[in-house]
Regions:
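Conserved small/polar residues in nucleotide/adenosyl-binding loops
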Residues: 149-151
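Short helix-capping and inter-helix turn/linker motifs at the boundaries of alpha-helical repeat units
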Residues: 1-2, 58, 115, 119
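Strongly charged, low-complexity linkers/loops
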Residues: 80-133
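Short, hydrophobic/aliphatic alpha-helical segments
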Residues: 1-8, 123
Length: 151
């Protein structure tokens, strides 16, 4: 079952269970997928699961950015809504590696390729993106990689 099919199935189950939070969030996900499909017409046949994963990650990132803004504005009601949406979206994402696992992976790649300069950061990020898309927080990778390459 593809990720898109799983989202559709969960959407239908949420409607049956009358879970309004899940329904609204899954509608949002389906809409984002449809928008992406429309923007790729003629360029690509259909969205792959990895395309959908990156889309879901961007949706989570948007929500986290919104939470920061809502915290500054002291809007706890909106923060709770965003957190609930993140929980639903994350059901479709693979488990993210923690900071220690991420650091170990980056150290290994740096040692294997003898990266010593910040100029090689792009190559490092490319390797990580190719091998760990969806499993690793790229924002965290950037911070850790900068600290390790400078050492």
């Amino acid at each position: 079952m593809s990720l898109k099919d799983k989202i559709e199935s969960d959407y239908n189950n949420s409607i049956k269970e009358k879970d309004s939070n899940s329904i609204n969030t899954l509608r949002l996900i389906k809409s984002a997928i449809k928008d992406k499909e429309i923007s790729l017409r003629g360029k690509q046949d259909a969205l792959t699961d990895s395309d959908i994963l990156s889309l879901l990650q961007s949706l989570v990132k948007q929500r986290k950015d919104s939470i920061e803004a809502f915290e500054k504005a002291n809007r706890n009601d909106l923060i709770e809504n965003e957190l609930n949406e993140i929980k639903v979206i994350e059901l479709f994402l693979p488990k993210q590696m923690d900071e220690d696992e991420t650091k170990l992976i980056i150290k290994n790649i740096i040692q294997e390729n003898n990266y010593t300069s910040i100029k090689e950061m792009g190559a490092l990020m490319k390797i990580i993106k190719e091998n760990y898309t969806g499993k690793i927080d790229m924002g965290l990778v950037g911070k850790i990689a900068l600290s390790l390459i400078h050492i």
